[in-house]
């Protein structure tokens, strides 16, 4: 550095250079430090959690048993509870109400006073004030002293002091409504499932507290109630619902008086090969564990060692067991309440309070060992499970050593099937995992060999959910994949030697391709989770259609994209004549067609519950509601059915007749002497899907109540229903073009595969992410495990949602 540069730096660095961010300005300047990532949605949802945590703290103190979270139509969120209500008195030091202090100043609140809250997860005045700072507006209502108080903030700034808006109110509690700042968050749309997961978690951890989640954003109001009296024991049973437990739950509930630390523990071993331990401190999840997790692991190992020594079972073991062996198949929820917890970061993902370790370790060791001694039969089953794990680990070790010795003698240890790339930098290298040699050959020809490697997998891929670790290592396909990636798995897992930073699963669009993709995802989730956590795992999105018009070609991802293309290709040459006079063209016609497309989607969704053609004709005549049961609707109903009977392409063109009863309507026709009947129940008309169809039909009712003539490229068509209109336009759009549907990757040539799926500048990739670990755990166990009942229930619950089934 030159002398001039030194002088410049010295002169510019003075007292004036030190900027002090006052009030909540610091939060708005660096929101990520306080609320988490503002781009990926985690920080946005943390806004809700911060407010809910304060209500939970009221519950922990014994003053609250009902919490309500409402997602409002305008995009705001309301969180209310029936606790004591935030204090409203004037704060002596600040000269404003305590409520305003809490909402506008960091590090101000009741959690710093040990008399107000013995245990707390969030900090009033840190959490809530941050929410206020990061909201476009926030409204606070407090019910306290038989009065209702109100105050509103804009971007964290008080509009007017706290005021009394109602008196003689027999109610206590707090209600916070906030609208996230568009300038802070990339996306301000809340995800119902993400919130549902966290609230369910809190309900399990706080037995006896009822939490309501209400979503008012859509026409169908969604409401979920969480209330569990079984506590964390019920939580473990919920997490492990798709596995076989080998013994009843072990429950530990104790408090260390001197430190004020309390412990709740529910644990059982199941017949799976994976451990699942959830750790919480003051209701906050620690994804990276901490001192409580270390203490638990140490205590469990000590319990098993001590029990083996006491009973003499250690003499029967073939191999020494490790800590990992003791936790194979374990499912545990560990919850500690700590008066003044210390975490490694603002996100509280790791507990570092050293005083927690001895309390947890001693309590777990004492209570679990006591349970083992009182339940010798169950204890013996657990020991057998652990010894089996030790034997499998030893077998896996020998298999690895054999593989290493074999590899050391070979010039190259890369699998022969792998067509590797020339690049040695993992950051730019990609590995495509493809199904079979046929697709593999095409992919090898079409790839960019500089950065893209191709690995074809042939034969049946092992379902690792049902296989031991040693059996998995002996699988040819899994072994080939592990070798190609350059890394080992499980205990030896490290991403340092990973040869590709994009691992892309590329399978066919049929049922076999979906199955292979699921098996591969199961392997990566179970044995290479860091690959997913780092964002290295992707799923390719090959097109389903190729459209050729003259010399031009276009690839389309799915059925919806094809439909949109066909509509757009004809819209400029299309007009709709209403009652022989008025005509719809251009934007107005496009708007109608968009509505018809939406209407068709609603009909498709409801078609599993009632006949589609009848639903449509009733809806566009304003009869797919309770009006159909009114006596005066008879003539309109018969007229609608006459229209349906006369439609040329109607599958129900068999002289459909109707018979009305008090609470049901029978639609019937005779075919080959047999009576075919479809029954519409009065109560069915209250189903959300049916109400949605009825209401949406009103937006196109005026159009379809007229006589319609569709003109496409000079050709005229009489149309009556929305489906007829849409199908006519689509069929006209197909004329003069060639549409090819790809069933598998092998049907494409190398150039097509490059243009659609391999070319980094044109392709679409789906990145695999796991947002909620225990929910993912449940899904993989349900779909890929060996317990049939949860899978049967899952299929029954979701079967009607399947639109296209490949069988």
Swiss-Prot record:
<dbReference type="InterPro" id="IPR034160">
    <property type="entry name" value="TOPRIM_GyrB"/>
</dbReference>
<keyword id="KW-0460">Magnesium</keyword>
<dbReference type="InterPro" id="IPR000565">
    <property type="entry name" value="Topo_IIA_B"/>
</dbReference>
<keyword id="KW-0238">DNA-binding</keyword>
<keyword id="KW-0963">Cytoplasm</keyword>
<feature type="binding site">
    <location>
        <position position="435"/>
    </location>
    <ligand>
        <name>Mg(2+) 1</name>
    </ligand>
</feature>
<protein>
    <recommendedName>
        <fullName>DNA gyrase subunit B</fullName>
        <ecNumber>5.6.2.2</ecNumber>
    </recommendedName>
</protein>
<keyword id="KW-0547">Nucleotide-binding</keyword>
<dbReference type="Pfam" id="PF00986">
    <property type="entry name" value="DNA_gyraseB_C"/>
</dbReference>
<dbReference type="GO" id="GO:0006265">
    <property type="term" value="P:DNA topological change"/>
</dbReference>
<comment type="subunit">
    <text>Heterotetramer, composed of two GyrA and two GyrB chains. In the heterotetramer, GyrA contains the active site tyrosine that forms a transient covalent intermediate with DNA, while GyrB binds cofactors and catalyzes ATP hydrolysis.</text>
</comment>
<dbReference type="GO" id="GO:0003918">
    <property type="term" value="F:DNA topoisomerase type II (double strand cut, ATP-hydrolyzing) activity"/>
</dbReference>
<dbReference type="InterPro" id="IPR014721">
    <property type="entry name" value="Ribsml_uS5_D2-typ_fold_subgr"/>
</dbReference>
<dbReference type="InterPro" id="IPR018522">
    <property type="entry name" value="TopoIIA_CS"/>
</dbReference>
<dbReference type="InterPro" id="IPR001241">
    <property type="entry name" value="Topo_IIA"/>
</dbReference>
<keyword id="KW-0479">Metal-binding</keyword>
<feature type="binding site">
    <location>
        <position position="508"/>
    </location>
    <ligand>
        <name>Mg(2+) 2</name>
    </ligand>
</feature>
<feature type="domain" description="Toprim">
    <location>
        <begin position="429"/>
        <end position="543"/>
    </location>
</feature>
<dbReference type="Pfam" id="PF00204">
    <property type="entry name" value="DNA_gyraseB"/>
</dbReference>
<dbReference type="GO" id="GO:0005694">
    <property type="term" value="C:chromosome"/>
</dbReference>
<dbReference type="InterPro" id="IPR006171">
    <property type="entry name" value="TOPRIM_dom"/>
</dbReference>
<keyword id="KW-0799">Topoisomerase</keyword>
<keyword id="KW-0067">ATP-binding</keyword>
<dbReference type="InterPro" id="IPR002288">
    <property type="entry name" value="DNA_gyrase_B_C"/>
</dbReference>
<dbReference type="GO" id="GO:0005737">
    <property type="term" value="C:cytoplasm"/>
</dbReference>
<dbReference type="InterPro" id="IPR011557">
    <property type="entry name" value="GyrB"/>
</dbReference>
<dbReference type="InterPro" id="IPR036890">
    <property type="entry name" value="HATPase_C_sf"/>
</dbReference>
<dbReference type="InterPro" id="IPR013759">
    <property type="entry name" value="Topo_IIA_B_C"/>
</dbReference>
<dbReference type="GO" id="GO:0003677">
    <property type="term" value="F:DNA binding"/>
</dbReference>
<dbReference type="Pfam" id="PF01751">
    <property type="entry name" value="Toprim"/>
</dbReference>
<dbReference type="GO" id="GO:0046872">
    <property type="term" value="F:metal ion binding"/>
</dbReference>
<feature type="binding site">
    <location>
        <position position="508"/>
    </location>
    <ligand>
        <name>Mg(2+) 1</name>
    </ligand>
</feature>
<feature type="site" description="Interaction with DNA">
    <location>
        <position position="463"/>
    </location>
</feature>
<dbReference type="GO" id="GO:0006261">
    <property type="term" value="P:DNA-templated DNA replication"/>
</dbReference>
<dbReference type="Pfam" id="PF02518">
    <property type="entry name" value="HATPase_c"/>
</dbReference>
<dbReference type="InterPro" id="IPR013506">
    <property type="entry name" value="Topo_IIA_bsu_dom2"/>
</dbReference>
<keyword id="KW-0413">Isomerase</keyword>
<dbReference type="InterPro" id="IPR020568">
    <property type="entry name" value="Ribosomal_Su5_D2-typ_SF"/>
</dbReference>
<feature type="binding site">
    <location>
        <position position="510"/>
    </location>
    <ligand>
        <name>Mg(2+) 2</name>
    </ligand>
</feature>
<feature type="site" description="Interaction with DNA">
    <location>
        <position position="460"/>
    </location>
</feature>
<comment type="function">
    <text>A type II topoisomerase that negatively supercoils closed circular double-stranded (ds) DNA in an ATP-dependent manner to modulate DNA topology and maintain chromosomes in an underwound state. Negative supercoiling favors strand separation, and DNA replication, transcription, recombination and repair, all of which involve strand separation. Also able to catalyze the interconversion of other topological isomers of dsDNA rings, including catenanes and knotted rings. Type II topoisomerases break and join 2 DNA strands simultaneously in an ATP-dependent manner.</text>
</comment>
<dbReference type="InterPro" id="IPR013760">
    <property type="entry name" value="Topo_IIA-like_dom_sf"/>
</dbReference>
């Amino acid at each position: 550095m030159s002398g001039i540069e030194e002088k410049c730096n010295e002169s510019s660095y003075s007292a004036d250079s030190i900027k002090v961010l006052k009030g909540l300005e610091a939060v708005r300047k660096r929101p990520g430090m306080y609320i988490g990532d503002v781009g990926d949605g985690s920080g946005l949802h943390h806004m809700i959690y911060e407010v809910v945590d304060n209500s939970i703290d009221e519950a922990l103190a014994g003053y609250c048993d009902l919490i309500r979270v409402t997602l409002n139509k305008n995009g705001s969120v309301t969180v209310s509870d029936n606790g004591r209500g935030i204090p409203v008195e004037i704060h002596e030091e600040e000269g404003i109400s305590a409520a305003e202090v809490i909402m506008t100043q960091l590090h101000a609140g009741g959690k710093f006073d040990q008399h107000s809250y013995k245990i707390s997860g969030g900090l009033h005045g840190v959490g809530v004030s941050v929410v206020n700072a990061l909201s476009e507006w926030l409204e606070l209502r407090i019910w306290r002293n038989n009065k209702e108080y109100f105050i509103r903030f804009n971007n964290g700034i008080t509009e007017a002091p706290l005021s009394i808006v109602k008196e003689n109110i027999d109610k206590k509690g707090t209600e916070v409504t906030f609208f996230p700042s568009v300038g802070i968050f990339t996306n301000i749309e809340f995800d119902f499932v993400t919130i549902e997961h966290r609230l369910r978690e809190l309900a399990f951890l706080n037995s006896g507290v009822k939490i309501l989640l209400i979503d008012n954003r859509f026409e169908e109001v969604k409401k979920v109630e969480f209330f569990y009296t079984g506590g964390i024991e019920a939580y473990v049973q919920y997490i492990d619902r798709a596995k076989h437990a080998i013994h009843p739950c072990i429950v530990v509930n104790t408090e260390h008086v001197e430190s004020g630390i309390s412990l709740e523990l529910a644990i059982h071993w199941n017949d799976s090969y994976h451990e699942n331990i959830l750790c919480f401190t003051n209701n906050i999840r620690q994804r990276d564990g901490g001192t409580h997790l270390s203490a638990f692991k140490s205590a469990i190992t000590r319990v098993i060692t001590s029990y083996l020594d006491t009973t003499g079972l250690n003499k029967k073991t073939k191999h020494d067991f490790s800590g990992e062996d003791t936790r194979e198949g374990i499912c545990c929820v560990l919850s500690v309440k700590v008066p003044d917890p210390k975490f490694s970061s603002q996100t509280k993902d790791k507990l570092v309070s050293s005083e927690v370790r001895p309390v947890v370790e001693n309590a777990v060791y004492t209570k679990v060992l006591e349970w083992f001694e009182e339940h010798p039969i169950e204890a013996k089953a657990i020991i057998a499970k652990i010894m089996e794990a030790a034997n499998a680990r030893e077998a896996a070790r020998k298999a690895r050593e054999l593989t290493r010795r074999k590899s050391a003698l070979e010039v190259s240890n890369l699998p022969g099937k792998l067509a590797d790339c020339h690049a040695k930098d993992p950051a730019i290298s990609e590995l495509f995992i493809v199904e079979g040699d046929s697709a593999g050959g095409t992919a090898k020809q079409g790839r960019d060999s500089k950065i893209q490697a191709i690995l074809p997998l042939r034969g049946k891929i092992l379902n690792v959910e049902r296989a031991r670790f040693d059996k998995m290592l002996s699988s040819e396909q899994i072994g080939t994949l592990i070798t190609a990636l350059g890394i080992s798995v499980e205990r030896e897992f490290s991403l340092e030697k990973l040869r590709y930073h994009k691992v892309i699963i590329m399978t066919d669009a049929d049922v076999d391709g979906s199955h292979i993709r699921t098996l591969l995802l199961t392997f990566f989730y179970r044995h290479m989770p860091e690959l997913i956590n780092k964002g290295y795992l992707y799923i390719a999105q090959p097109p389903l259609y190729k459209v050729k018009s003259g010399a031009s070609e276009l690839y389309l991802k799915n059925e919806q994209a094809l439909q949109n293309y066909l509509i757009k290709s004809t819209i400029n040459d299309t007009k709709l004549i209403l009652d022989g006079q008025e005509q719809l063209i251009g934007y107005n016609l496009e708007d109608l067609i968009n509505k018809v497309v939406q209407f068709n989607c609603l009909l498709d969704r409801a078609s599993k519950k009632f006949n589609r053609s009848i639903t449509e004709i009733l809806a566009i005549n304003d009869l797919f509601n309770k009006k159909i049961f009114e006596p005066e609707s008879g003539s309109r109903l018969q007229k609608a059915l006459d229209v349906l009977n006369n439609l040329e392409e109607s599958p129900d063109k068999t002289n459909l007749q109707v018979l009305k009863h008090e609470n049901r309507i029978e639609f019937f026709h005779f075919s080959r002497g047999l009576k075919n009947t479809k029954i519409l129940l009065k109560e069915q008309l209250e189903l959300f899907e049916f109400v949605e169809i009825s209401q949406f039909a009103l937006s196109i009712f005026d159009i379809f109540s007229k006589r319609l003539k569709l003109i496409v490229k000079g050709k005229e068509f009489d149309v009556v229903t929305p489906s007829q209109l849409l199908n006519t336009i689509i069929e006209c759009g197909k004329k003069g073009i060639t549409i090819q549907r790809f069933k598998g990757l092998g049907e494409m040539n190398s150039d097509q595969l490059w243009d659609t799926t391999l070319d980094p500048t044109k392709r679409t990739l789906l990145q695999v992410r796991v947002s909620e670990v225990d929910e993912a755990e449940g899904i993989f166990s349900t779909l890929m495990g060996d317990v049939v009942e949860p899978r049967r229930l899952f299929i029954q619950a979701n079967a009607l949602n399947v639109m296209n089934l490949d069988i």
